């Protein structure tokens, strides 16, 4: 049943990508369309709903801050103002909902991190993928992340433990967008009622996204939980 669901979902995603590129647009035109879609998304007061009409995520109207403001605020985003920091070098927008418990991934470390997420296609205005509920996938997406002198890289676990990102897109390398929060969040496990794991929201352009987004030039919104895997 799961294999059928992922095959069907992969076909839907591929078809959506075909539709987005089927009018012979140039790459420059596609990028311009993506930029306009992101600009509109920031202002639209979006609420993401599921197939049954249930509310999954209230995105709201987004207030963009600079990296300098973000650093001046101790690398935090003000949730009351619904702030997202824009990283100028890669076009990723990030909101830190919770900084998490435990420790950051230190230089020289490789750690296993489990992720639960939703993926929303901004250009297609649709919920595209999720593993935050067991109906879609019982496994979280597990990535082995390495911090090499402050530069993060990662690979998704494959095989029987593969999560929905690898099963859907077939790409072992972790997308840049998912790695962007790691310098600023702690990765641990919840052991008390108050100590909740890290949670972020991201707007990821195609240049930092998964393979289908990169091929078809569309941005995605993510809400992701980061948790340290058990030994």
Model-derived segments and spans:
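Alpha-helical transmembrane segments
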Residues: 11-15
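C-terminal motif of bacterial Sec signal peptides marking the signal peptidase cleavage site
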Residues: 16-20
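Cross-family detector of peptidyl-prolyl cis-trans isomerase
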Residues: 5, 21-231
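Bacterial N-terminal signal peptides that target proteins for export
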Residues: 1-9
